[in-house]
Amino acid sequence: MKNFVFISPNFPTNYWQFCRELKNNGLNVLGIGDQPYDELNPNLKDSLNEYYKVGSLENYDEVYRAVAFFTFKYGRIDWLESNNEYWLERDAMLRTDFHIKIGRAHV
């Protein structure tokens, strides 16, 4: 099964639909965010296979450890996205550090 890590899946609030469709298409949808799990939209909770709460998405080390945990538990990460312009550089760094080749432009 393919693994999709979604950074900050709770923002904007309608992104749970993206997670739902990924899950409906057979992917493990693994969320990383700084919002407590109990405060997530119920639709988002149902759309995620697992959620890892970090203290701050600004802390690269915390987010890195979250991706490492998912890699250990679920195997290779196939996609990593936030779909949020603010996190694009962070997404790219994580893709590089975890050798994630799918979901990025090849030059």
Protein language model annotation of sequence segments:
Residues 1-106:
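ATP-binding N-terminal substructure of ATP-dependent carboxylate-amine bond-forming enzymes
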